[in-house]
């Protein structure tokens, strides 16, 4: 799957945001308020939001954190100026559909991580090395790929690109959606039981540090 950038996205109407991230003087920013949007189930985005909050408040801004349920709601808020900044955007791949829709009203303020990547991953003990190996383990996997939220970009890409590319769209396979935390819980249970499991993951994400997992090869670059 494709590599992307993790960036800061801002509402064009919020001229204060660019100054905040450029560390302008407190005297210029004192009293101004920034609304930072995030999705609480996406822990990497939560971390970036709080780090951004600390930095902009050092420069005299006040902040409001707004927890939104889905990326579509977040990007709608950005486009309307209800949200000033989203600190964990994936503009080229994961959130491309929203940038295509709202891009004229949203400004990309720059990248903080240049090698973000969407993957399907397995525990290190897995007999699978490639996505192409998955059909041979259908019974062990119960014909399921364990995913995250239904509205997530990786879910859409998994269903619309990866499944068709590898013949997993015949009606017997499912990308199971629920939440990021539910996916991590299923991963942990499978590892504890030494069972096969395939989950949708991405870099950077803390699960790679906590669990002994590895990415499946994607020879078709789906």
How would you label these PLM feature ranges?
Residues 42, 65-76, 174-186:
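Short helix-initiation/N-cap motifs at beta->coil->alpha
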Residues 83-87, 157-221:
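Ligand-binding pocket segment of bilobal, Venus flytrap-like solute-binding proteins
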Residues 71-121:
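N-terminal segment of the mature folded domain
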Residues 31-43, 63-66, 142-146:
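Short, well-ordered beta-strand elements
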Residues 22-23:
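C-terminal motif of bacterial Sec signal peptides marking the signal peptidase cleavage site
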Residues 52-59, 138-175:
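Ligand-binding cleft/hinge of the Venus flytrap
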Residues 1-16:
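N-terminal secretory signal peptides and thylakoid transit peptides that target proteins
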Residues 104-151:
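A conserved helix-loop-strand patch within extracytoplasmic ligand-binding domains
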């Amino acid at each position: 799957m494709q590599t992307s950038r993790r960036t800061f996205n801002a509402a064009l109407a919020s001229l204060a945001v660019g100054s905040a991230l450029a560390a302008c003087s407190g005297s210029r920013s004192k009293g101004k308020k920034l609304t930072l949007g995030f999705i609480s189930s996406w822990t990497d985005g939560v971390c970036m939001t709080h780090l951004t909050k600390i930095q902009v408040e050092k420069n005299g801004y006040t902040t409001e954190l707004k927890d939104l349920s889905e990326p579509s709601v977040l990007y709608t808020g950005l486009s309307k100026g209800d949200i000033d900044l989203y600190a964990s955007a994936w503009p080229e791949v994961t959130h491309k559909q929203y940038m295509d829709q709202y891009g004229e009203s949203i400004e990309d303020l720059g990248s903080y991580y240049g090698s973000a990547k969407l993957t399907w991953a397995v525990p290190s003990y897995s007999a699978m090395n490639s996505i192409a190996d998955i059909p041979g383990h259908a019974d062990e996997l119960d014909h399921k790929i364990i995913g995250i939220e239904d509205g997530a970009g990786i879910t859409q890409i998994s269903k619309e690109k990866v499944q068709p590319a590898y013949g997993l769209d015949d009606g017997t396979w499912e990308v199971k959606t629920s939440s990021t935390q539910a996916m991590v819980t299923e991963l942990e249970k499978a590892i504890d039981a030494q069972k096969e499991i395939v989950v949708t993951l991405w870099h950077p994400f803390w699960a790679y540090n906590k669990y002994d997992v590895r990415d499946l090869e994607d020879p078709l670059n789906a």
